Amino acid sequence: FATTTDGATWSKMQGGYEPGFWLWRVRYHNGAFYSAAYAAVRPTPAARETRLLRSEDGLNWELVSIMTTERMAGEADLLWRPDGSVWVLTRTGDAAGDAEWFTSDAGMKTWTGKGTGTPVHSPVFATWKDRVFVAGRDYRKDGSTTKLWEFKDGACVEVVTLPSRGDTAYPGLLVDPS
């Protein structure tokens, strides 16, 4: 990152965390920023590592926990549940190719993972009333589509496939409070 006070003169670029880690879908919760950051090449793509990071200012990041070193996990989103638990849904790059669902208690130190049976790239969570939804790219050999699923009991139940062309990843979800 770089900083400026006038929009014309900028500081020297500096990293906010270790080189090689990508901060993915940063979330704000209880006065801090969080990201499930991953290293895509460490030392090889098969050795990916996903870490939960925390920041007070969004610029300087510290390690909370290592979530996983398995299944070539990468792009992920976080969701804090009313019971205090934390959920993470992450894209995987192994042969199975389905998204992995991780759960932890409020301390976010120990994570338990389970395959969902559904490929979800670039996942994003949203809660509406007492229901949890996830959107992302469903990547298949015959083409990619953007989908919305309801997330129930660790599984993705398809709600709708959106008209899709090209790279259909990186969706966002906005819940209308009315």
Feature map (PLM): residue ranges:
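Beta-rich carbohydrate-recognition and catalytic domains
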Residues: 1-167, 175-178
